[in-house]
Amino acid sequence: GEKKTVTIRGLSTDIYDRVSRLARETGTTVGEIVNEALRRYIATLENISKAIDNMIRAGDVIVISGVSSLTVTRADLETLDKPVVFKDMDELVFADDVNNDLIKSKVARIVNVGTVYVPKSVSTLLIASKSELVKKIVPR
């Protein structure tokens, strides 16, 4: 499309420096790299959205969202008759009585959550395999 100068407020100087270096090393421009990165990021978000929408439409999952902080116990997960998608939260805390088997059977996805806290007995890789756009997974 048409090119114009755009200012991005709040862009991390570290990210800008890395993109700038990448542009020099690859012989492209900062704009081209940012455009491609945003294009891929948006496509990823759209794909995640579509996948979750399909699961919801098929009636395969329960969605819990719009809560800033949530603590989930074994009993909470066992009460559900379908796997759950946790989305759009600052933090999600799995209580100490939650184990790997319960995560495998009852947690469909964790999407757009700042920090997920898990008991030390729960595999962080298992949590990561069910996560999209999760900033941190912290064993406690």
Show where each model-derived region lies.
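Short Lys/Arg-rich basic patches
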Residues: 1-12
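Short, basic amphipathic alpha-helical segments that act as recognition/interaction helices
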Residues: 28-52
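Short, positively charged interaction helices/loops
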Residues: 43-76
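Repetitive beta-strand solenoid architecture
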Residues: 66, 80, 88, 94, ...
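Short, solvent-exposed loop/turn at the beta-strand->alpha-helix junction
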Residues: 97-101, 123-124
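General marker for long, soluble alpha-helical cores
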Residues: 129-139
